[in-house]
């Protein structure tokens, strides 16, 4: 059965993070996740996760949206070392990394080589700490105009060149629906490279029911691959938050 994780950045936004964690646990979810770790009360988050006995499925590298940057490798490596310390303290094994936006004054291949170099340096730190980096393609048509990494095959090309078991892909089923669709075929073909999933309904980035994706079929396909990681819910609810998250949970439990 697919294991769902709740991205607490998107839900109960008026509440402290520790209260959000408690509510995720009360609904019966098996894990939670969040984005960046800076400017958060990590002690309170750790206490809340331990009280709820709830694993942290993923968090983002600091600095994020940065793997494309020029002359940034030392900063990225240092940021990954700091992120690894936080992840170890919180018991998190999966680190989300986004790439950043296109440089208009250089060719695709020059950019690609730098992204691979920067990502490989960060992945080496992750590998040394028993962590996995998941590179996330995003959509450029609605949410992230100018973002460089947009398609699954492009991400596969990068992680294959890095050639480390600590280099994987975050397959976001909202972003990929917008950019190329073909969700089930792609996730089935690339599952050995996928280390995490995100979900949201399209259009709108809202609930999983009512959009153009059939998440029951998608979850069945993920399950059929033998994938043992988490599928993160990263959407903006239009319903009451508790009602919305109960609805999402019913897709894997009902």
Locate predicted features.
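N-terminal small/glycine-rich loop or linker at the start of catalytic domains
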Residues: 1-10, 56-67, 99-103, 142
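A short beta-strand-loop structural module common to alpha/beta enzyme folds
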Residues: 30-39
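Active-site-adjacent beta->alpha loops and helix N-cap segments on the catalytic face
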Residues: 38-50, 105
